[in-house]
């Protein structure tokens, strides 16, 4: 009887142990194994850990990144969300009429979606207004992020559409995080498009028009060395260095652009 009781106790203990689920971390856990040295070097200007902390990204979140390009942030976010959350890349369509878009979308797929063993189950949607305006299913995202894209949307005159799409994709209480090259206050629209620098006031207005509430700003990605007046706009600075060897040392010394880091919230119902 005692032996049977001991066996039963051991069996119950085993069942209880089997029911215990792995503890979900309360903050993002980073795996930089697959990042190249040149990508890590940009952390000094892009501050990914601090930026994502400011936006409040959690490991259980569904996070949509608009136009991730070559996937600099994908390498950081996708592994950190794997298993508990979901990374969604709202990328350029494979059939876009813009050659640059199709080229880099193909590169993204080869690097990321073809390697779930590294980056997990990445979800990719096609986003290119005015044809493709759905970032993700309505009210499915906890966080929508965009890094240095607003000036691109302005050049096509669909920046408001993008902010509206972000609002629709987010759950009530969800966060929109925007990082963008920061123009001097009062800069005119055409100058913003030509230079790549956008005013904070204009970004705030776009968000407000979409229905967002402003939730805070951070100077994490500020660069006081950036004078914002260059022959080839913001692309004069690294990492683009559009002027190539011309005054290269000067521009490398300035570093990457001065950037706003703004947080907006979709009001709860």
Segments the model singles out, each with a brief description of its role:
Residues 24-59:
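Class I SAM-dependent methyltransferase Rossmann-like catalytic core
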Residues 59-69:
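Conserved class I S-adenosyl-L-methionine
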Residues 78-79, 159-172:
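A short glycine-rich, Lys/Arg-flanked "PGG" loop and its adjoining helix->strand segment in the class I
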Residues 88-90, 173-181:
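Conserved beta-strand signature within the Rossmann-like core of class I S-adenosyl-L-methionine
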Residues 101-133:
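S-adenosyl-L-methionine
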Residues 129-130, 152-165:
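A short, conserved alpha-helix within the catalytic core of class I
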Residues 133-144:
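A short acidic, Gly/Pro-enriched loop at the edge of an enzyme's catalytic core
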Residues 227-269:
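Core SAM-dependent methyltransferase catalytic element
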